[in-house]
Amino acid sequence: MTTEATALAYKVADITLAEWGRKEIEIAEKEMPGLMATRRKYAGQKPLKGARITGSLHMTIQTAVLIETLVDLGAEVRWASCNIFSTQDHAAAAIAAAGIPVFAWKGESLDEYWWCTRQILEFEDGKGPNLIVDDGGDATLMIHLGYKIENNPELLEKVPGNAEEKALYQQLREVYSEDTQRWHKVAAEMKGVSEETTTGVHRLYQMMEKGELLFPAINVNDSVTKSKFDNLYGCRESLADGIKRATDVMIAGKVVVVLGYGDVGKGCAHSMRTYGARVIVTEIDPICALQASMEGFEVTTMEDAVGEGNIFVTTTGNKDVITLEHMKQMRDEAIVCNIGHFDNEIQVEQLNSFAGATKLNIKPQVDKYTFESGNSIYLLAEGRLVNLGCATGHPSFVMSNSFTNQTLAQIELWTKEYSIDVYRLPKELDEEVARLHLGQLGVKLTTLSKEQADYLGIPVEGPYKPDHYRY
């Protein structure tokens, strides 16, 4: 059941959860020094005054701290989650109770999800956003696809390829029936988007290469203080949290197959090994495969690993990396989950439509599929993000890194004029984000002397590494 206020001020699961949410937000603020320092730094300046920000990013306690930071800096904000299972209902309630429009609840249908995304793109007096905080690119996609449809209405006749596409097109049909130039007007006022995750960044670069990108974008994901912290250290803790909350399984002694060894895969593989699992990695990239092997992981193909694994984790950002055929070949009681952004890494639709499997829901976000052979598998979070679907996502401290980058990116886009392209935050800001988090960990930095800095050919105060340095 959802609760709706007049004029669509919010739609959340239960507004009475707001007090609980507020208590957890206050705890999270103590663990998010970067965001709180950014609030203090810009308190008198209000650098986002006049900005209308659409946020499509997991509606968690940590995100609530980001939202209130953007509001503190002067922005008008509307928010929805970027995943049907990732909302923490008490966090959404707290934000709604604070008077910030939010449209999010845990367990949305796909139709509800795209309805929520539409709501956050509709401000008062018919206006749209002029900035977007995106995670996975769905808010950006809705504008771009709507824009294409206005140029070629025949696209509305397209037969949807899947249930998600069907839900998205239904919303776009309704918008087009109300205003045939809605998305052109929205795009004309957009100053830019800052994108949180690898999948969304891929979408942006693809649009840029095709000449379809309508406004500037900042790739927050590839800031060092995001990708090397959130993706790596965040997953290192939250993957195990999701698996254990969902299944209570003992990880020690199990065989865990991690598909992909990018930053997310690295965090997952090291996490599972720390728990005592034997970890097998699959990879397409020879560099990542060599890294995994040099770290002591067995690297092989899914075809070779499928009969060995007790737990399978997809981390690739690609589609169909675990197929229906793979799942049919898995050991009895294997656990299958995904920590990449979208659910198409695992062939969930094919599994659900397969007549040779019987589905039994064990509890929310845990489903057992029994095949004709008698073997069963457990699918977590319906193939969506296991750490957010079955747990509460990354810890506050590491999200402070990511969200400080997001805040700085929004300030950059709002206060400066960027041409249409995909950018990264400058190295100085990356280092500043890191610096803001050192004090809480008791870190003391060594300071270069002028002579040492001159010897290295860098400023005393940094930046200390060239842009091509990989960390």
From Swiss-Prot:
Belongs to the adenosylhomocysteinase family. Substrate binds at T60, D135, E196, K226, D230. SUPFAM superfamilies: Formate/glycerate dehydrogenase catalytic domain-like, NAD(P)-binding Rossmann-fold domains. This is Adenosylhomocysteinase. It is found in: Cytoplasm. GO terms for cellular component: cytosol. Keywords: Cytoplasm, Hydrolase, NAD, One-carbon metabolism.
